[in-house]
């Protein structure tokens, strides 16, 4: 593994050293586990005690952070971003080894760039394309007419179905499926004389995954009924997410695990959806919208709004409702007592109840 002096790391991430810049570091580790030859980072005050007790040779911190006496630190504007860049230096991305494994299946009409790597039991179908320096792990299937761009990594058992397109520098984690059939059925009460049935609507569109996207393990992006389901540039989608047919996910959006987006909904740029949030179909979710975990979005959301709850409402109102809910039992008791008191007062005054 490579090693760097603290001064070299500072130059790479645009930081300032406080302490020994000549200190040589050979790895990065959590505060609790880092040794004197490793660097760590501190950006969450929950871990203040771990920071103070850490044996790390150096720690990445932000400009205003208070530092124990004698602690060597690297001050940067954004500690988490600097951590990511330093971690990449110590653990660089895997590079393709230009080869096609003997047990891989490449159709004669497929075009696989000579610099790409196709591992055992991967399959590239008729008229499919795999770009320069891309890596296909074992069990990957790139179907008929599908396209995978340059510098992509498709991990084990990824499926890119027919006519779907994956851009450049895309990462698809294990089990990800691009272009599965959308969930479309028309109810036929007669069933051509065989009784009622759900008649399958052909899903003849495709999926386009733009550049610099990452999709998590076992995430599914359904092909459009007609046209294109699109994942915008730089979007990052976690494990076990379901994107339905004809959905448009805007650039730089973040969808956390188990989010579900129903058909034909459009997400703007930079939308963030917390884990297990559900969004019904045919909605417009504006740029920069934030959706709380486990929310159920059932109406359009304007750009810049933050919503929570089910059905989702503006976050501030939801917080007030949750605060009231905690006291609901006591409020009910108080109301019951007040009603009894009113009844007693009416009885004393000789009034009839309304």
Curated annotation (Swiss-Prot):
It catalyses: a UDP-3-O-[(3R)-3-hydroxyacyl]-alpha-D-glucosamine + a (3R)-hydroxyacyl-[ACP] = a UDP-2-N,3-O-bis[(3R)-3-hydroxyacyl]-alpha-D-glucosamine + holo-[ACP] + H(+). Keywords: Acyltransferase, Lipid A biosynthesis, Lipid biosynthesis, Lipid metabolism, Repeat, Transferase. The active site is at residue 245. Transmembrane segments: none annotated. Coiled coil: none annotated. One of its GO terms (biological process) is lipid A biosynthetic process. GO terms for molecular function: N-acyltransferase activity. Pathway: Bacterial outer membrane biogenesis; LPS lipid A biosynthesis. Pfam families: Hexapep (PF00132), LpxD (PF04613). InterPro entries: Hexapep (IPR001451), LpxD (IPR007691), Trimer_LpxA-like_sf (IPR011004), UDP_GlcNAc_AcTrfase_non-rep (IPR020573). SUPFAM superfamilies: Trimeric LpxA-like enzymes. It is an enzyme of class 2 (transferase). Its EC number is 2.3.1.191. One of its GO terms (cellular component) is membrane. Belongs to the transferase hexapeptide repeat family. LpxD subfamily. Homotrimer. Catalyzes the N-acylation of UDP-3-O-acylglucosamine using 3-hydroxyacyl-ACP as the acyl donor. Is involved in the biosynthesis of lipid A, a phosphorylated glycolipid that anchors the lipopolysaccharide to the outer membrane of the cell. This is UDP-3-O-acylglucosamine N-acyltransferase. It comes from Anaeromyxobacter sp. (strain K). The gene is lpxD.
């Amino acid at each position: 593994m490579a090693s760097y002096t603290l001064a070299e790391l500072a130059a790479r991430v645009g930081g300032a050293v406080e302490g020994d810049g000549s200190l040589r570091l050979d790895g990065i580790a959590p505060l609790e586990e880092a040794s004197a030859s490793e660097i760590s980072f501190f950006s969450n005050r929950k871990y203040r005690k771990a920071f103070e007790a850490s044996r790390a040779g150096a720690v990445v911190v932000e400009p205003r952070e208070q530092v124990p006496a004698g602690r060597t630190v690297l001050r940067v504007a954004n500690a988490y971003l600097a951590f990511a860049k330093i971690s990449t230096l110590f653990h660089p991305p895997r590079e393709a080894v230009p080869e096609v494994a003997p047990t891989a299946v490449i159709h004669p009409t497929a075009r696989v760039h000579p610099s790409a790597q196709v591992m055992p039991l991967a399959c590239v179908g008729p008229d499919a394309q795999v770009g320069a320096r891309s890596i296909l792990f074992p069990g990957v299937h790139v179907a008929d007419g599908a396209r995978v761009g340059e510098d992509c990594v498709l991990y084990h058992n990824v499926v890119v179905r027919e006519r779907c397109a994956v851009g450049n520098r895309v990462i698809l984690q294990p089990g990800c499926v691009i272009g599965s059939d959308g969930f479309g059925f028309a109810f036929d009460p007669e069933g051509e004389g065989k009784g009622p049935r759900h008649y399958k609507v052909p899903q003849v569109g495709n999926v386009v995954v733009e550049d610099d996207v990452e999709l998590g393990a076992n995430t599914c992006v359904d092909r459009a009924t007609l046209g294109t389901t699109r994942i915008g540039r730089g979007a990052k989608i976690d494990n076990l997410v379901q994107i339905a047919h004809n959905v448009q996910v805007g650039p730089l959006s973040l969808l956390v695990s188990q989010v579900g987006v129903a058909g034909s909904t459009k997400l703007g740029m930079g939308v963030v959806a917390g884990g297990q949030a559900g969004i019904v179909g045919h909605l417009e979710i504006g740029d920069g919208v934030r959706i709380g975990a486990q929310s159920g979005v059932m109406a359009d959301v304007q750009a810049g709004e933050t919503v929570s709850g089910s059905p989702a409402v503006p976050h501030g109102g939801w917080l007030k409702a949750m605060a009231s809910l905690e006291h609901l039992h006591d409020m009910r008791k108080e109301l019951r007592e007040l009603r009894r008191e009113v009844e007693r007062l009416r009885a004393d005054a000789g009034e009839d109840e309304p």
